[in-house]
Amino acid sequence: MKFVIVLACLLAVVFANEEADVVKSDSEVNLLDFNYAYELSNHIRAVQTGALKEHDNWVVSGEYEYVAPNGKTVKVVYTADETGYHPKVVEA
């Protein structure tokens, strides 16, 4: 469920700017793990990896980055597991 929420948030950011083109897109989905990365022409980028652990718990880590309205780059590095979503926001 947490993965779905994080993915929905990232997709909302992606589709908020319909003028952006996909510059890079990679993904690999397996039964027990996954990873993906994308970069858009408007300087939004994201990377995420995840693995299925015991008792149907996913452990996910990743980061995304975008340019805020004030012109500064914002980067969020996060993990998500059975204890919740743990982001760390860095503004460059």
Swiss-Prot record:
The keyword RNA-binding does not apply. Keywords: Cuticle, Signal. Component of the cuticle of the larva. Residues 31-92 form the Chitin-binding type R&R domain. The keyword Iron does not apply. Residues 1-16 form the signal peptide. One of its GO terms (cellular component) is chitin-based extracellular matrix. One of its GO terms (biological process) is chitin-based cuticle development. This is Larval cuticle protein 9. One of its GO terms (molecular function) is structural constituent of chitin-based larval cuticle. It comes from Drosophila melanogaster (Fruit fly). InterPro entries: CHIT_BIND_RR_consensus, Cuticle_Struct_Prot, Insect_cuticle.
